[in-house]
């Protein structure tokens, strides 16, 4: 399956996530993204750096696609953020970072479960 297919099928295809991307763990490239979910080089570098020191994300927040999210969880492989009733789930694997945005109609736990499950699968196949 291509990286774009993971975004389109495994994330957006659930109907719970409305925008998503997969970026390199090094923060140097976007591997796949949904239409209109434009992550700048500075944003993905900042996100990748946040996984080196997750607690630092509580001070800076998460800036993605021009929006600043308040960090509500930052530990291990997962960084979660919230902006009013919508939010962002970021999960790192060995080689990539999954970024899922959920709308106010999706519960945060639903979006986290979907994104974490895809991360588990990718880890299991060596990514």
UniProtKB/Swiss-Prot annotation:
GO terms for cellular component: actin cortical patch; cell cortex; cell cortex of cell tip; mating projection tip; medial cortex. GO terms for biological process: actin cortical patch organization; actin filament polymerization; cytogamy; mitotic actomyosin contractile ring assembly. Its main location: cytoplasm. It holds the Pfam family Profilin. GO terms for molecular function: actin monomer binding; guanyl-nucleotide exchange factor activity. Transmembrane segments: none annotated. SUPFAM superfamilies: Profilin (actin-binding protein). The keyword Cytoplasm applies. It is found in: Cytoplasm, Cytoskeleton. Keywords: Actin-binding, Cytoplasm, Cytoskeleton. Occurs in many kinds of cells as a complex with monomeric actin in a 1:1 ratio. Binds to actin and affects the structure of the cytoskeleton. At high concentrations, profilin prevents the polymerization of actin, whereas it enhances it at low concentrations. By binding to PIP2, it inhibits the formation of IP3 and DG. In S.pombe, it is essential for cytokinesis. Belongs to the profilin family. This is Profilin.
């Amino acid at each position: 399956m291509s990286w774009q297919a993971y975004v389109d099928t495994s994330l957006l295809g659930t109907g719970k996530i409305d925008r998503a991307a997969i970026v390199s763990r090094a923060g140097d490239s976007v591997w796949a993204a949904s239409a209109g979910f434009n992550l700048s080089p500075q944003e993905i570098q900042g996100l990748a750096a946040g996984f080196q020191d997750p607690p630092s994300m509580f001070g800076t927040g998460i800036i993605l696609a021009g929006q600043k999210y308040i960090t509500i969880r930052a530990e291990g492989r997962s960084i979660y953020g919230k902006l009013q009733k919508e939010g962002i789930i970021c999960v790192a694997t060995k080689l990539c970072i999954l970024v899922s945005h959920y709308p106010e109609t999706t519960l945060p736990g639903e979006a986290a479960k979907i994104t974490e499950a895809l991360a588990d699968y990718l880890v299991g196949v060596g990514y």
